[in-house]
Amino acid sequence: VKKIVFSIFNDNVDQNHKSTNDFKLSQFKKWAPRLEFLQREYANKVGADYVLHRTNTTDYNSIQFEKIIQFEQYAEQYDAVLYLDFDVVINNNAKNIFEMIDLNTIGVYPLERMKLKGNHRDPEYSKLRSFLRQDNFDNQNIFCKTCAKNAMLLLDNQIGTNKLYNTGVVVGGSEVIKRLQFGENLESLNTLLDEARDDCLYPIEISKHFVYNNEVYVTYLIEKNNIPYTDMGIQWNFILDKFQKEPVDSAYFFHCVNKEFERTLL
């Protein structure tokens, strides 16, 4: 099986997104050599090629689209593909993901829009009411992104789930990746998102935050086309952010959304 692990990086991204503020960019510049080393070392460990794409694209959202398009392009050359955001730190206990995830499926970690109990990232009903009253949503809010995906599905006469797939870590075999057809449908996905924003069951406080987004589109495509997927589990995409600041030893990949790399690299 011919395998590849890849990531994408630009240390001069436009500062027009909350993921590209001064602190986060400076952290990337400081830790880039170590991040690349660990990802490359992991690829070697699992018998895969490794490529770090140093893109010239400076728009954050465009880079997010670029990574999924590259994911599809590698499926034309390789039997199995693993994409890692460049803020994903490999723990030294990480197993071979190509052996742990069914490569007849897309392996992703789903975040759920709402549960009454469970994951502490899930917004409580009372908090949602408060957000609506105070107009506190933003376009990176998981609830808004899931609503956008479901609004797109409603225009196709389909009922969506409460899931949104985080694309910081994505793995799959070439045949199932080819079923995504993200790149060739990007223009029509943008058009459908625009329609979903304008013709929407959701309140304006939510729908005004519907924006072009790779996670919205990937989840939409998987659900619309019934593409087989595997919930890879939190250990493969252990998100470190304002809700979960400290790493745990049992995780394989730390997804440092907060860019506080010192917590995992020191």
Q: What kind of feature is each model-predicted range?
A:
Residues 78, 86, 104, 250-251:
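Short, well-ordered alpha-helix to beta-strand connector turns
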Residues 1-34, 99-101, 164, 176, ...:
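Long, low-complexity, intrinsically disordered polar/charged segments
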Residues 1-78, 257-262:
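N-terminal anchoring/stem segment of glycosyltransferases
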Residues 58-82, 91-98, 106-109, 165, ...:
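A conserved donor-nucleotide-binding helix/loop in the catalytic core
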Residues 143-265:
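Catalytic core and acceptor-binding pocket of nucleotide-sugar-dependent glycosyltransferases
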Residues 5-6, 51-53, 82-85, 107-109, ...:
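A structural signal for short, well-ordered beta-strand segments and their strand-loop junctions
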Residues 14-15, 58-60, 90-93, 98-99, ...:
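Short catalytic/ligand-binding loop motif for oxyanion handling, primarily in non-cytosolic enzymes
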Residues 90-141:
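Conserved donor-nucleotide/metal-binding helix-loop-beta segment in metal-dependent transferases, i.e.
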